[in-house]
Amino acid sequence: MKTRHRTARRLVLASIGLALASHGHFQASPSATYLDATRVTAAFAKGMPLVETGGYKIHASRREAPGVAEVHVQDTDIIYVLEGTATVVTGGDVVNGRTLEGTIDEIRGASIRGGTAQRLSKGDVFIVPNGVPHQFTEVQAPFLYYVVKATDGGRR
């Protein structure tokens, strides 16, 4: 089990590195970002973003219940589960999908028709490419997970 978690952590770190490298973030930058444990713990208590830049976002996500169907036109979600279990449905078609108010690249809907279900639990890594419908269902709270959102920036 320890090997599985170690492998999952390595995959998450490699994904973060690839996301940053693909957006030129290994060039000279003004400074590194440090987030202390107090800030991270507080973010998970509410479920909120930790870092948001033009090339990537890192969220401390918390789910207490199932969510709506979502499509991120530009963001690929790289998810690492810290605690709890949930089923995520991906693919298929969004039922009653609408563009989220104030955005042009975020779609929300009631559910997903014809998708594939995957059970997620502690230590799992799950990647949802941009443009792929996804919805969390059957959530056992609290479901805590990091999401690294690698932004496509419109390059397709």
Predicted regions and their residues:
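Short hydrophobic/aromatic-rich beta-strand segments that constitute the beta-sheet cores
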Residues: 60, 88-90, 145
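His/acidic/aromatic-lined binding-pocket segments of jelly-roll/cupin-type domains
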Residues: 70, 77-80, 117-118, 125-126
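Sec-dependent N-terminal signal peptides
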Residues: 11-18
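Short, conserved beta-strand element in jelly-roll/cupin
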Residues: 73-74, 78-88, 92-94, 100-111
